[in-house]
C-alpha cells in the first residue's frame, strides 16, 4: 500500500488547509505583480501560514475528540430513582404458608419485638392514625371504625399497596378485614393490638389473586408478610419508634476498641489520629488510624442489636450497621446488616491468645435500648469493637461501595497529615501560655456533614435492594 495512504486524517486536513492558503497567497502575489506594486515576500509571512495550517489540524482534532466524548455510551446507577422508563420487574406470587422474610415475625430482621398492647385509654393511643383512603374498603365488623386505626408506618405501606392493587387489577380494590383490635380476637402476641398488623384481601374475594396480593404487599414495604390462609393475607410492620430511631450505624459509647499499645479504650474517649485494631483487606488484623467520626452523640437514646457469641464476646450495634459474617461452607466473608444476623451464624472475633481473627458462633440475638452513639471511621473501613470485627459503615449492604464513597475523606485526611500541626504554627510567646485543648471528636455532636450528605442522596442513586429499610 502507498505510504501516503497511511497518513493520519489530521495530516490530510493540514495539507488541504495549506494548499488553500497557498492558492490564495499565489493569487494575491500575481495581482500585485500585474499592478506594478513591490512585493515584500518575507519568510515570517510564510511561517505564519504554516502555523495557521497546524492550528487548523489541532482544531479538527479537538472537535473530533469532543464529539466522541459527547456521544460515548453512558453508564448509570440503576434502578434507583431517576428519569426514564422503569425497568419491568417479574413478580412471582407467594405460595400458601410462605412468609417473607423467612424469619419469625418478632425477630429484628422482620417486624421486631412486641412493645405492648395499646388500649383506648393508653397514652400511646394518640399515636394511632385513621386511614380514610378511598381506594381501600374497610370491613369494620365492629362498627367502631377500629379497622381504620393503625400506626403511621402501617398506613404508609397500606396506601402503597392499595395503589399497586388498582394497577394490577383495574376495578379491584384492597380490602382490610382487620387492623387495630381491642376485642382480643387474636393470639396473645398479635401485633393487631398495637396497630402494626393488618389482615387483607381483595373486595372481589377472588382467592386466586391472593398469592400475588401477598407479593404486592412485600413490594409495598411491609416488614413481614404471611400467606397464612387461602382466605386472607397477614401483614405487619416495625414500630414507629424503631423506624425513627437511628437510621445510621453506630456503637454504644462504652464499647471498647484495642489501641496499638494493647490498651482497651472506650469509643467515647477515642480521638482522631488514634490507631485501633481493625481488619485489613487481606483479612488479617491491622492497626488503622481513626480519621473522623461518622456520628457522635453521647446523649441520644437508641435501639441496638446485641450479638452474643459462644466465646463470650458481646457486640452492641445499631440495626443498620454492617457486621462481618463468616460462611464456613464457602469459606467466604460477607457483610450483613446487624438486624439480619441470626443465631448459628459466625462472626470474626479477635483471639486474645494468638491475636488472630477467628470465627465464633452467634448463640443469641437480642435488642436493647441504650444511651449514646459513636461511629468512628478508620482508614481501613473496619474496626474491632468488643473483640468482634465490624464494618465502619451502615445502611448500604456493600462494604466496598461504602468504602469507595468515603475515599474523599481519606484523601482529605492524608492531605491534612502533610500540613504542619497547629502547635507548630504558634509563636514562642503564645506557646508559653497555658491552653486547654479540645479534640475535634469531643467538639462533634451529631452526624458528620459528609456522611449526612451521602445518606441523603442514597435513595436517589442506589436500588432499594441495596439499602437498609
From Swiss-Prot:
InterPro entries: Hedgehog, Hedgehog_Hint, Hedgehog_sig/DD-Pept_Zn-bd_sf, Hedgehog_Signaling, Hedgehog_signalling_dom, Hint_dom_C, Hint_dom_N, Hint_dom_sf. One of its GO terms (biological process) is anatomical structure morphogenesis. It comes from the Eukaryota. PROSITE patterns: INTEIN_N_TER (PS50817). The record marks 321 as: Essential for auto-cleavage. CDD domains: Hint (cd00081). Keywords: Autocatalytic cleavage, Calcium, Cell membrane, Cytoplasm, Developmental protein, Hydrolase, Lipoprotein, Membrane, Metal-binding, Morphogen, Nucleus, Palmitate, Protease, Segmentation polarity protein, Signal, Transferase. A lipid is attached at residue 249 (Cholesterol glycine ester). GO terms for molecular function: calcium ion binding; cholesterol-protein transferase activity; morphogen activity; patched binding; peptidase activity. It is found in: Nucleus; Cytoplasm. The record marks 318 as: Involved in auto-cleavage. The record marks 249-250 as: Cleavage. The keyword Hydrolase applies. Ca(2+) 1 binds at residues 141-142, 147, 178. GO terms for cellular component: cytoplasm; extracellular space; nucleus; plasma membrane. Coiled coil: none annotated. Interacts with shf. This is Protein hedgehog.
